[in-house]
Structure formats: C-alpha cells, structure tokens
Amino acid sequence: MSSHLRKKLVIVGIGGASCSGKTLLAKHIRNALPAGATIIHQDDLCHPEEKVPYSSRYPDLQDWDDPDTCIEWPKFRSLLHEIRQSGNLPSHASHDHLNKEVKVEVKAGVFERWKVELEKLSKEQTGQGVELVWFIVDGFVLYYDDVLRSRREERQVYVLQPGGVWVDPPQYFDKIVWPGYLKAHDHVFDGVETGPLKEEWSRRLILLTPDEGEEGMTTAFDKSCEAIVEGCRNGAGSFIPTTS
C-alpha cells in the first residue's frame, strides 16, 4: 500500500544548550511516533579533535562551541539536502550511544495520549495518500542557567569522532560553551540571555522553558507533540521527489 503513497518529509528541530535534555526529548518523541524517526545529532558532525581551533580569548583551550566552527557545516548542509531529496540518511558515524545519559521519563498517561494522537495523524495522512517520513535534528540552543553548567561539569567526558575522548577543562562552560551559545543565538532573541524570541522567529519556533525532572520533561514532550501535530495538520513538511 505504501508504494502508492506520496512520501512527505517532516523534520523536527530540537534546540538546547549543552546538556539541556534535547537528545532525551528527541528520543521520547521518536518512541511515540508510529513508524519511529531518524535522529540526527549535530554532535556527530563535530570536527576531529586535531582540527578544532583554540579560543582567541583563552589560547590554552580548544573551542568546541564557537558556532562558526563547532561542526562541519558543509557536511551538515549536504546531509540535510540528501534527506530532503531521498528521505534517507546518508551513511555517517554516530557516537551518541557511547555518551552518558541520565534517564528522565515522560508521564505514562501523557506519553500514551500523544502516541494515540500521532497514530491518528498518520492514518489521516494515509487517507489523503501521504506517508509521513520523520527526521529529528537535535543541536545546541536554549536558555542558560546554573543547572546547565552543573550538568556540563558532571558530564565532562565526551566521546569524539573517530573514537577519541574529550574531557572538559576547569571553567570550560563559562569560558567557552556559554559564550558560544550567546554568539549563535543573538539574532534569535531580543536580549539573548533573558529576552523573548524576536518577532520573526516567534512565528517559526516554539520556546520551551520546562522545570527539572519528569514534570519538566513531560511538559516539554506535551508541548512539542502538540506543535508537531498542529504543524502537520496545517501543511508542514515537504514532499520527497519521486524517481521514475
């Protein structure tokens, strides 16, 4: 049956500062989707350690978080282009499964409610001759607070490509990570540290500032799924070109 359906690509972007819970949220959403989803982690597109530049302000520290150089941008753009053209993820190495992850669950009732709603959405689209193909991209954005700093300091060891290990030096979050976030998102907010989204971005993004723990993750999951379903019913996504 699916061979007669037009494939429609839906890419869900989840931004968050380092250790803000974006990857965990992405996995909860993936698990609720009836056909699952492919998750793309921007962390997998970081440069090899030997190509990471040193900070101009702190020349003894490598700067993994400057938005201009934090990932291989041409490779990332090429990967997204291929996904839009084929609906398939090009081969690339991922090390997400090797990184330490603190599990924070979504309340079962909320998860099941959205699982049913997403299944309903899928059937609606099938009835219209459309098969939804899901991708989730998680990358570094969101607000900063002391909890993010403590999480980064607790998770100081990062697995790198192709198999190396990076350990955060002292005060790395304050000197490198947070300034990189500010630089990357100054154009998105009216006052990047405490201000709201700029008007042109408020029409395109959903800003989430949930609490800690299961309650906060449940809120983030709930709001995200609501936005996803509403967006799809309003025509979000793009059709994947067919080949003859």
Where do the language-model regions lie?
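NTP-dependent small-molecule kinase module
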Residues: S2-L5, K175-S244
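Conserved nucleotide-sensing/catalytic segment adjacent to the nucleotide-binding pocket
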Residues: T38, H47-V110, K115, D174
